[in-house]
Amino acid sequence: MTEESNVNESNEASEVQEDHGSLVAARREKKRQIEERGIDPWGSRFDDRILIGDIRSRLDEVKFQKEDGTLIDLPELHEDPEQRINMRQWRSDNGPGTEIGPQVRAAGRIMLQRDKGKLRFIDIQDWSGKIQLFVGQKQVGESDFELAGLFDLGDLIGVDGRLGVTNTGELTIFAEKLHFLTKSIEPPPAKHVGMTDPELRQRRRYVDLAYNDGVLDRFMNRSK
């Protein structure tokens, strides 16, 4: 190995360490702001939640109710975005009406966030599955929407809301109330890198289970 490559690796390691430090500092600042709102950032009870896998199995309870009260089953939904139906067009074709669905309570780890101004889309996951949350400023109120701005990937949150389907055909919980459960100070591994070091994966098994695709499924299958 040349001296130049040694220098390059040293510089890269220094940059990674600096980036990690700034990410941790930002998360600690958000934790402080959460505490200022009177919320315990290290753990809160959240009783009567439903497993995400069980919530997803209740898709058949989501209906389109026409103005005359007639209930129409929704079309088949697909996990593949390329195969999803344009639900906006489907609803328009079926005439004036409203989508109805069961009230659900879920909790999970934040795996993905998308900020759309006065809307946020958040993917949460527990050991049984993953689901999208629709968080609208109008629907959850100013206080909860501001709280959502303090969320980070890896945080544990709870939600109360209505199960439904977005215009793009994705099964979603339309949030009415958010609950902050636990702050994750340590940022997750980069999605394109993950955790590949065997020793590190053993030492930080909780991270391996949470973020590496397929690890939790294999663990659950072996435990049966």
Where in this protein do the model-derived segments appear?
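Class II aminoacyl-tRNA synthetase catalytic cores and aaRS-like
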Residues: 1-224
